[in-house]
Swiss-Prot record:
Pfam families: YjhX_toxin. Belongs to the UPF0386 family. HAMAP family: UPF0386. It comes from the Bacteria. It comes from Caulobacter vibrioides (strain NA1000 / CB15N). This is UPF0386 protein CCNA_00226.
Length: 91
């Protein structure tokens, strides 16, 4: 499955324990999608378009009205990436 770079970044943040929280208007339409890492930082690559494409591909899901998290299908389609918490130049 083809996944764009912003989608990959969002999925990696979700795989490390992050979540996507939505803001809706009075009609129930999505205004913004905020991807928060497990440390509480916001990911700027996560837009409404990225959220909708991940949801359409069933790579993320919400359970019992909670925030959106990565699914097993999302984990299976995620490409391996080194943990980006420590840069290679730091060693």
């Amino acid at each position: 499955m083809n996944i764009s770079k912003p989608q990959q970044r969002t999925l990696h943040a979700l795989a490390q324990g992050g979540r996507i929280e939505l803001e809706r208007d009075d009609n129930g339409r999505i205004i913004s999608a905020d991807c928060l890492t497990r440390d509480g930082w916001a990911l700027t690559d996560c837009t409404v378009a990225v959220f909708q494409s991940l949801k359409r591909k069933r790579l993320i899901a919400s359970q019992d009205g909670g925030p959106y998290r990565i699914t097993r299908l999302g984990l299976a389609n995620l490409r391996a990436q080194l943990d980006n918490r420590v840069g290679a130049k730091a060693w």
